[in-house]
């Protein structure tokens, strides 16, 4: 009797697996379909965007400039590559953080929408003739402690993020705007 129950369970399991697999395999077939199957072109289409200027590593901002503007000692550049940099106090994740990001072929509107959903305010801004947004984040104990500036360059944009974790601190938006100005001046 025990073998019969086990055999029945295995048969049921096999039937269930077949019920799942058969529709999946059938979905891969175009049998009975009146739709023609298109070919994939091997020639590249005109999918390249219109890129803005080139930005040097870290937006052209040195570690010394970051320390001077933020008034934070012991800043360490913990992430540095061709599209962004991040500075942390003492290299740790607890404390103030500052970052530069360069988004090639990415819509600034999506980033702005994210900011609108998560920040206290988001406004239009123009820096050196380039438009974008400025987003302010605040915390009850700190006030306005975070500022992000995103500036569009055709199909690209850059973003500076400045965030403090304890008082006193200089104006996050003053710093973010100055870093953005300097990065624009450093672009080619």
Curated annotation (Swiss-Prot):
Pfam families: DUF3558. A lipid is attached at residue 28 (S-diacylglycerol cysteine). GO terms for cellular component: plasma membrane. Residues 1-27 form the signal peptide. The keyword Membrane applies. InterPro entries: DUF3558 (IPR024520). Keywords: Cell membrane, Lipoprotein, Membrane, Palmitate, Signal. A lipid is attached at residue 28 (N-palmitoyl cysteine). It is found in: Cell membrane. It is a lipid-anchor. This is Putative lipoprotein LprB.
